[in-house]
């Protein structure tokens, strides 16, 4: 079999264009992991978020490792009313967490 590979996680905040259109979507990209099973949890200021979450099924990359993404749909009000949002990825018992904070000035 293949050696285990820990996922690399990238978290993108909502774009300013999106916020102007009165939407806010956070995107958590999870890539280069093996085996192809991950658990994704979202948090707002450290408390779990369960609504508006959509996570894709991991798909195999050309290098035989897996990639997945998770989306969190918010309103701009929700986005601005928290200090930080985190995407927490659990893979093979270890956890990677990435956090974004709304920009103070927008």
From Swiss-Prot:
Assigned GO CC terms: extracellular region; extracellular space; IgA immunoglobulin complex; IgD immunoglobulin complex; IgE immunoglobulin complex; IgG immunoglobulin complex; IgM immunoglobulin complex; plasma membrane
Alphabetic keyword roster: Adaptive immunity, Cell membrane, Disulfide bond, Immunity, Immunoglobulin, Immunoglobulin domain, Membrane, Secreted
SUPFAM superfamilies: Immunoglobulin
GO molecular function terms listed in the Swiss-Prot or TrEMBL record: antigen binding
Pfam families per record: C1-set
InterPro entries: Ig-like_dom (IPR007110), Ig-like_dom_sf (IPR036179), Ig-like_fold (IPR013783), Ig/MHC_CS (IPR003006), Ig_C1-set (IPR003597), MHC/Immunoglobulin (IPR050160)
Main localization of the protein described in the UniProt heading: secreted
GO biological process terms, semicolon-separated: adaptive immune response; B cell receptor signaling pathway; immunoglobulin mediated immune response
Subcellular location: Secreted; Cell membrane
Keyword rRNA-binding set for record: no
Domain (Ig-like) ranges: 7-101
PROSITE patterns registered for this protein in UniProt: IG_LIKE, IG_MHC
Disulfide bonds: 28-87
Superkingdom per UniProt: Eukaryota
Misc. remarks from the entry: Displays the following serological isotype: Mgc-, Ke+, and Oz-. Mgc- has Ala-6, Ser-8 and Thr-57; Ke+ has Gly-46 and Oz- has Arg-83.
SUBUNIT field: Immunoglobulins are composed of two identical heavy chains and two identical light chains; disulfide-linked.
Function comment: Constant region of immunoglobulin light chains. Immunoglobulins, also known as antibodies, are membrane-bound or secreted glycoproteins produced by B lymphocytes. In the recognition phase of humoral immunity, the membrane-bound immunoglobulins serve as receptors which, upon binding of a specific antigen, trigger the clonal expansion and differentiation of B lymphocytes into immunoglobulins-secreting plasma cells. Secreted immunoglobulins mediate the effector phase of humoral immunity, which results in the elimination of bound antigens.
Protein name: Immunoglobulin lambda constant 6
Taxonomic source organism: Homo sapiens
Gene from which the chain derives: IGLC6
């Amino acid at each position: 079999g293949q050696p285990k590979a820990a996922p690399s996680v990238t978290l993108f905040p909502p774009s300013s264009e999106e916020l102007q259109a009165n939407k806010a979507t956070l995107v958590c990209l999870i890539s280069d992991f093996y085996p192809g099973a991950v658990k994704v949890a979202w948090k707002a200021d450290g408390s779990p978020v369960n609504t508006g979450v959509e996570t894709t099924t991991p798909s195999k990359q050309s290098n035989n490792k897996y990639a997945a993404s998770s989306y969190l749909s918010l309103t701009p009000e929700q986005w601005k009313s928290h200090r930080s949002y985190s995407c927490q990825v659990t893979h093979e018992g270890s956890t990677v967490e990435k956090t974004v904070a709304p920009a103070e000035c927008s």
